[in-house]
């Protein structure tokens, strides 16, 4: 059986994005709402505050900030290229929207998506060329949380050897 697949890149891009997010000091500091933090703290972010799928816990008791992401292949226009989308959701409890950090402005969610966009802007690890930000829109997973949704386009070869 061949180790190549049209869909294989979805998982590999999630791994690459997860690594980029947890390796950003600014993003980790915002998610923890503290500095300093240690390596164990960062490892604990995955599947508690950073999810490789859209996560909304309606029964949560902790007030946290979340980053979720998904990779989609909405179409395959040619025999060699596939259109891929990277969707990132950043949201936090409405009671914790106030946040400040030098060099950034806006609410906690505004600052978080700015940090994420800055982390990804010049990356060449996704598809062919650089990621193209298509939209940044409001996102309300429930009545207590508010956030933003980033959508990136990333064309790639139909089958790659990642």
List each model region and its residues.
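Short, flexible/disordered intra-domain loops and linkers
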Residues: 3-6, 98-107
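Residue-level signal for secondary-structure boundary sites
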Residues: 77, 94-98, 158-162
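A general secondary-structure signal for short beta-strands and their flanking turns/coil
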Residues: 62-66, 81-85, 143-149
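Short acidic, glycine/tyrosine-flanked loop/strand segments centered on an H-E-D-like triad
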Residues: 83-100
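Small/polar-rich, solvent-exposed N-terminal microdomains that initiate assembly or binding
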Residues: 1-78
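Solvent-exposed residues in well-ordered beta-strands and their adjoining turns
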Residues: 72-74, 89-93, 153-157
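Acidic-leaning, charged glycine-interspersed low-complexity segments
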Residues: 28-30, 60, 106-162
């Amino acid at each position: 059986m061949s180790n190549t697949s049209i869909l294989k890149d979805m998982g590999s891009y999630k791994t690459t994005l997860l690594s980029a997010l947890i390796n950003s000091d600014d993003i980790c500091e915002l998610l923890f709402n503290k500095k300093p933090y240690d390596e164990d703290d960062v490892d604990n972010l995955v599947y508690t505050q950073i999810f490789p799928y859209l996560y909304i816990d309606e029964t949560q008791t902790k007030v946290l900030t979340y980053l979720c992401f998904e990779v989609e292949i909405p179409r395959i226009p040619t025999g060699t290229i596939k259109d891929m989308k990277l969707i990132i959701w950043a949201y936090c409890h409405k009671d914790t929207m106030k946040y400040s950090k030098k060099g950034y402005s806006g609410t906690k969610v505004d600052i978080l998506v700015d940090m994420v966009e800055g982390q990804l802007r010049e990356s060449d690890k996704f598809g062919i060329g650089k990621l193209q930000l298509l939209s940044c829109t409001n996102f309300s997973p429930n009545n207590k949380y508010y956030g933003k949704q980033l959508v990136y386009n990333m064309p790639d070869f139909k089958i790659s050897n990642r």
